[in-house]
């Protein structure tokens, strides 16, 4: 077992570490099929060997060539550390700056086997959300961070540490870009080749920006989504006895089970990967499991009748579950489901993100690498069956929404019946959850703010929970609009119940949907608590990229923007640059995330609070921009809620001056002006 000191000493070369290959007992990423030419295979190998001196290249070349041909990528398994990968307390990292140690804390959390989906392939979540492309990059990055001073910035090119460059103490310590390819080459096919060559990487969202906090990171948003789906579609506040059916128990989708329990409904979640299902059950995120469809339906009926709170994991394909629910409806007249969605990794449907109903899990894993064309055909056939079952249930009082995972987009490409008559190209038969629910929340400036206590002490997290609750209660007492008060009340309920629901997996972290005012106030309160010693170590502030300003994604985050700019990425890019200018400790900008490669531009940040006045100033400045940027853009697109919020924010901050839109007063003016 190596130490953190050894881990940060660079690439171990003399002697080389033992090549232990792929580990047993942990899930592994599906085999990739980049279809490289012989010349491209040589280039991939040449690129990998750049990290190593000539005296070890011959030995490593044979290993790396075998990895490339066997797994479709060079992961450099020999250099996978033997040390336990987890978020160690910040004081244990051998660093010259606290900021660098905090970044190390976050990186190692992303690769913790309790957190990461495929830890040995450096995938945190989403099937292909990489932290790094290979283990040499990880080791070099840790070495650079251990040497970094307050007058250097580490530059990351899609997993590759380009090096430490001189900068000012107020500059970011780390700047990350992932997948920044020329737009004409941003196709799925090109990505597979470029990733195999080791020159780009799909960082998902918080995987490649080192800000993932386990499935808790999406629980709060899922709670708000299901809660508001009940309000909007069912007209109720209390979801007792209501059934929510969906799929996925992975790094992000695993949140659905916990969210169902928190909102008090019956959640039935299908998962084809037994390892993922067992992992969530052992972590207490899933109450019951079954691999019998008959038992699943019987248990669902029982819980529905008794109005139990239940999260039930079905080990099987969700298409079988949907088709069985149709069978029950057609034979008994009983509709057993009220709400439905899907969280398969449909952004990556042909390489392990979606498993076709016609095959077992192992059969699918084999076919996707041995015959990709046949596998794609089965996936698309399965998607058509999937949608057909949902369409039948939707003829009754059942409501389905797309969870921003490209499910309806891929279903459309597969020829499924998801078209909406008279709709634009961003709309389908069923709404995106952003269009009907989260879009208005974002427009009011609320989004998935989060923080991580780098001490690793649960008591520090408890202090932050108390501080956040007090901040929100004070905001309500000071007076807020009714729509904002509803958000605050939902968030107070969340933070009060967070500890009870054992949400922490990995680092001592908390997610809380908050607006600009709330984020700034919480940050200031936490920073003051660090200064006074109530919190023992620095706290990292961050957020999901899936936020007010962080992501341009026409089929998810910006799907409720209707002025034609939903396909433009100025907001996300400006956010990345603006955060860097205003005090972020690190920033990241990614291609892809959520809906998939080429469909999204998104970014995130990390901001280390250390109890200093400078940290408070940075938090005030950066967090204000990080929210107002997106609210201003949503206002300009014509969203009335965003208009109201940005006007209020300008009244409170004389330095903020935003261009406001004028509505066309008379629609006939347009028609008359364009008359032939």
Swiss-Prot record:
The keyword Lyase applies. Keywords: Histidine metabolism, Lyase, NAD. NAD(+) binds at residues 126-127, 204, 251-253, 271, 317-318, 343-347, 354-355, 403, 594. It catalyses: 4-imidazolone-5-propanoate = trans-urocanate + H2O. The modification N6-succinyllysine is found at residue 534. Pathway: Amino-acid degradation; L-histidine degradation into L-glutamate; N-formimidoyl-L-glutamate from L-histidine: step 2/3. Its cofactor is NAD(+). GO terms for biological process: L-histidine catabolic process to glutamate and formamide; L-histidine catabolic process to glutamate and formate. NCBIfam families: hutU, PRK05414.1. PANTHER family: UROCANATE HYDRATASE (PTHR12216:SF3). Belongs to the urocanase family. This is Urocanate hydratase. It comes from Mus musculus (Mouse). The lineage of its organism: Eukaryota, Metazoa, Chordata, Craniata, Vertebrata.
